[in-house]
């Protein structure tokens, strides 16, 4: 399935000047290389992995990060939803709605594949 998602992204980004897609081990990553900044965005978890302005890295992942399907990437800026941290330590207004055994830390959005709905570029 990952190869299929990669192919869909490649087709979506084929006419883009600054955007492309590459595989990092098992995960497709959208790569943005603009004259003013660069960034990497994982499709799994819609997670910002890297951001740099000119040659100054502002955000990055550990060199030991593992790009595995279904495994949350440590670092970057993840989407922590629908809860943050240990599900049991969230307030009752959140934890009362969690009805799964061993819920993942920071919710399930981090390990789900997201889809690119729309894309545009500007200079």
Tell where the protein language model's regions lie, with residue ranges.
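Surface-exposed acidic/polar loop and edge beta-strand patches at domain peripheries
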Residues: 2-123
